[in-house]
Amino acid sequence: MDKLRENYFDILELPESLNVNASDIRKAYYRLSRQHHPDHFSGGSDAERNKAILQSELINQAYKVLSDDNLRMKHILDIYGMLVENEQISLPREFLLEMMELNESFEESDLTDPVVRADVEEVVESVEEDLVEEVSPWLKKFEDGQRDKQVMEGIRDYYLKS
């Protein structure tokens, strides 16, 4: 799939991945922050200072997004045009019904009771495990360099469900 906008991986000079090492993100951020810090351009022209400020802001935003697993996934989906504002994306009916039933049962539950709370946490954990199992093949394909529509839709569905 084609990329629709600049991505934060390029800005931090990191490989595009859903599983970027936090240490690599931090190192790239510090290196680029020092290199593009506006104070280094205090003697330069207004244009140079403004460019440094904008670059610094972009580096900060890239660090924030790539450091958060959920924001990183959303960013990748945005890059590939998989999250279009106001686009109607339908999730499987069975999944939506299951979530409605779970929400209703949670609302009716006494979460102050430790036993009930443990049961609820177990159900949530089970749903999360099922989602991870469902998306794992798509994540592997993405990490192996596949960016076709089917792979990106599988990742998008996981993102929307989680």
Identify what each model region corresponds to.
Residues 1-162:
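C-terminal accessory/regulatory regions appended to core domains
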